[in-house]
């Protein structure tokens, strides 16, 4: 296992699942974009929002692929919605969904870019959000 792959696995285990915010300060570079800014604090803001909505949210790694300065992580997640998730009020429902996260590392082994693709439609359906077709006409 490469150092970058190990760092990606640690990022998911420590920051996402265990909520060990100090690990984000070790793993994430100052210039890494996040929610409303850059650096570990901005990356943590995104995870804090998820944990506030789904306090028991846990991610399970399905695939991890490392090449050069990048690591791709395919995952499944599940949790109970106990807080607001965007405009969706707490439902108390358990939702499971999947996604992929792509990480880019600098030469020192710190994360400099994070990109997520999440099955948001899948998640919102499980929370009872009604999906309507787009409006047509004027």
Language model features by range: what are they?
Residues 1-138:
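C-terminal and inter-domain tail/linker signature
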């Amino acid at each position: 296992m490469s150092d970058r792959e190990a760092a990606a696995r640690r990022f998911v285990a420590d920051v996402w699942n265990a909520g060990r915010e100090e690990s984000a300060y070790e793993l994430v570079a100052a210039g890494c974009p996040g929610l409303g800014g850059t650096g570990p604090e901005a990356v943590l803001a995104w995870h804090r929002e998820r944990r506030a909505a789904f306090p028991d949210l846990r991610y399970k790694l399905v695939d991890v692929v490392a090449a050069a300065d990048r690591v791709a992580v395919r995952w499944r997640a599940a949790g109970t919605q106990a807080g607001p998730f965007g405009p969706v009020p707490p439902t108390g429902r358990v939702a499971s969904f999947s996604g992929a996260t792509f990480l880019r590392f600098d030469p020192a082994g710190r994360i400099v870019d994070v990109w997520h693709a999440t099955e948001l439609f899948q998640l919102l359906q499980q929370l009872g959000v009604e999906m309507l077709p787009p409006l047509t006409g004027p």
